[in-house]
Amino acid sequence: MRTHFAEVLARESACLAGVTDGAKLAGWRRRVVEELMTPRSPYVFALRQAGDGAERADFLDRWRELIAETLDRLPRSGATGDTHCSSGQTRRADVDPQKTAVLILAALHGGSTLSRIAKDPWPLNAALDLALAPFAATEDNGPARTVMSGPIGTMSP
């Protein structure tokens, strides 16, 4: 388990270091969704397997901090209360990076669990859409998406 934690943190540290605007945050998001939808990915093992409680807590705390640092680093305008990213996307300046990082981790964990059960990435994408809404790093979940199967398949977008 320690190996999966270390691998995820190494990848996240490298990838999140390059996130400087909403477009790059959306790219990070797509990559993480792809990792979580790949059954034997280290991300899947790190989030879904039980392990030593202190080890898991340390892993999640370190990942949360990487995400929070990234969110805090995104451009701000300060004066208007909105942030304008270089891609033309906006975010509110009053968004708490620490709370948002916790929300993103909760979306990754819960969304990936629901997506695994449904065999459909829609629940994970929906959870991340809401968590990342202040940064406009969302995906199009329009009518072209696949119909969900399984017990949560009756949910509609």
What name fits each language-model region?
Residues 13-41, 101-104:
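Hydrophobic alpha-helical connector segments
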Residues 36-61:
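Amphipathic alpha-helical segments used for helix-helix packing
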Residues 10, 53-87, 98-102, 122, ...:
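Amphipathic alpha-helical packing segments from all-alpha helical-bundle domains
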Residues 42-47, 94, 116, 143-144:
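Short, hydrophobic secondary-structure boundary micro-motifs
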Residues 35-38, 90, 104-122, 134-143:
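Amphipathic C-terminal alpha-helical segment
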Residues 9-16, 51, 112-116:
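Short amphipathic alpha-helical interaction patches enriched in hydrophobic/aromatic residues
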Residues 76-94, 140-156:
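Intrinsically disordered, low-complexity terminal tails and inter-domain linkers enriched
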Residues 2-9:
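Short, basic, alpha-helical segments at the C-terminal edge of helix-turn-helix-like DNA-binding modules
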